[in-house]
């Protein structure tokens, strides 16, 4: 397994404690080109990030170190947890998504 680093500027600067991490949240990029997804995840203008990106070739890209809060879950909650960015590791899977709009599902 090959790992590279391409750090995103989009994360909370205050470190969290390892025991604060309770969840792993998987997302897919939903973009046709992997390079566009990487550009978005590393652009300060986008204000989104993840801890890890799994590329199409299986390579893992580290974007935010685990002890920092990446901006991947937005306004979120699960059971008694609110703002899941604080308590989770965000993993993006490079994937263009689907051709259907959500209206048709």
Predicted stretch roles:
Residues 1-82:
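N-terminal catalytic cores of peptidoglycan-degrading enzymes
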């Amino acid at each position: 397994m090959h790992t590279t680093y391409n750090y995103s500027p989009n994360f909370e600067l205050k470190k969290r404690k390892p025991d604060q991490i309770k969840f792993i949240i998987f997302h897919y990029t939903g973009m046709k080109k992997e390079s566009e997804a990487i550009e978005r995840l590393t652009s300060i203008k986008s204000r989104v990030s993840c801890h890890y990106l799994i590329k199409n070739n299986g390579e893992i890209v580290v974007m935010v170190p685990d002890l920092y809060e990446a901006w991947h879950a937005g306004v979120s909650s699960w059971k008694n947890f609110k703002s899941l960015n604080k308590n989770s590791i965000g993993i993006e899977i490079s994937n263009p998504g689907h051709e259907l709009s959500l209206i048709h599902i």
